[in-house]
């Protein structure tokens, strides 16, 4: 049997496509699936490729050159643990296991520590781009032992997407243990925010301005030529022009307004809460999906709860431009929050995350790829210790020029009774972050009153408690 250079466990669409991607770069790839018929199906479909068909884990491991490089593309959670448990007795010290699933970062940290005791290297790798990206080039976020990553880097750099701006591969070492999967988690949280902001923009254009799908599609097409140039804007304009293949009209109008999720947005918000990082926009985008699932209750509520009538009579062209500015402004708030979370996590877990590089490897292959990511890289190149993107000169200038549009759009939506939780959250975050003084002094006084939680003073150092129960 030919010695394979790389192995992939899991022949669902992502695993199959990654295996084919690696093979297309000149490598021989061993493939294995728990259900042998699936492995045979993939092998038969691609007999002209340098794939090694294996029917048992023993055969799979035996087919690989040492140190073995094995990528797990199985369901996150218990299935990954079970696969590792089955593989472990067959591996030698120095072998490398790569988890390319949508894994929660604490699981990656645990597995990394457990496998290190056995001398097995473990690389948790976030993979973004979906099934097409897996085949043609994803964005990849690996974390684990640096020396182990160096052994897989040549393959990863070949299979990763290449940024159109400079041809650089969209993969880089993120840091120790769970760093890669953490970065992918935040990527997914930002993705939630981007999608909700676009949805709210669409809703305003449709329900407030009364525009047709064709008109909205043309607007998104124009927006994709400027600052908002991104994959999600690109696919939105494609979605809006597609007709229903089972009837009349547009397919988007026939899709039930209940948004699903796989939990990664929730993970991002949970981690932010654990770290004490404000992440309001991304968290609102998660809640927006949740409330969308309450369809039956919303239908009932729509019949009994009153709201204002939508009666717009202004300049539509002017409002469209304000919505564009509000969308870009709010997108900046989302990324500022996400990168602030990455900074706090990096400090907490001692990862030394490369913030500018993270923005670079998101420029192609992934769902949130966007032109403005270069502005983020530039910001961190100028100041690697930048506390928040909003403090960078470029973003200071944009927010100064665009904030009025956001305030107008939020006011318009509120007066029309149109929910825009992420737009509203964006301007509130901005105003909170730029406020030298917030009313938290009153909250701290209340906490001290009922729970003797103490407080600090503005005029002198120390921790204080006031005797609230003594008459003044």
From Swiss-Prot:
The gene is gnd. Belongs to the 6-phosphogluconate dehydrogenase family. Keywords: Gluconate utilization, NADP, Oxidoreductase, Pentose shunt. The keyword DNA-binding does not apply. Catalyzes the oxidative decarboxylation of 6-phosphogluconate to ribulose 5-phosphate and CO(2), with concomitant reduction of NADP to NADPH. InterPro entries: 6-PGluconate_DH-like_C_sf, 6PGD_dom2, 6PGDH_C, 6PGDH_Gnd/GntZ, 6PGDH_NADP-bd, 6PGdom_BS, NAD(P)-bd_dom_sf, Pgluconate_DH. Disulfide bonds: none annotated. NADP(+) binds at residues 10-15, 33-35, 74-76, 102. PROSITE patterns: 6PGD (PS00461). This is 6-phosphogluconate dehydrogenase, decarboxylating. It comes from the Bacteria. Pfam families: 6PGD, NAD_binding_2. SMART domains: 6PGD (SM01350). Substrate binds at residues 102, 128-130, 187-188, 192, 262, 289, 447, 453. It catalyses: 6-phospho-D-gluconate + NADP(+) = D-ribulose 5-phosphate + CO2 + NADPH. Its EC number is 1.1.1.44. Homodimer. GO terms for molecular function: NADP binding; phosphogluconate dehydrogenase (decarboxylating) activity. The active site is at 184 (proton acceptor), 191 (proton donor).
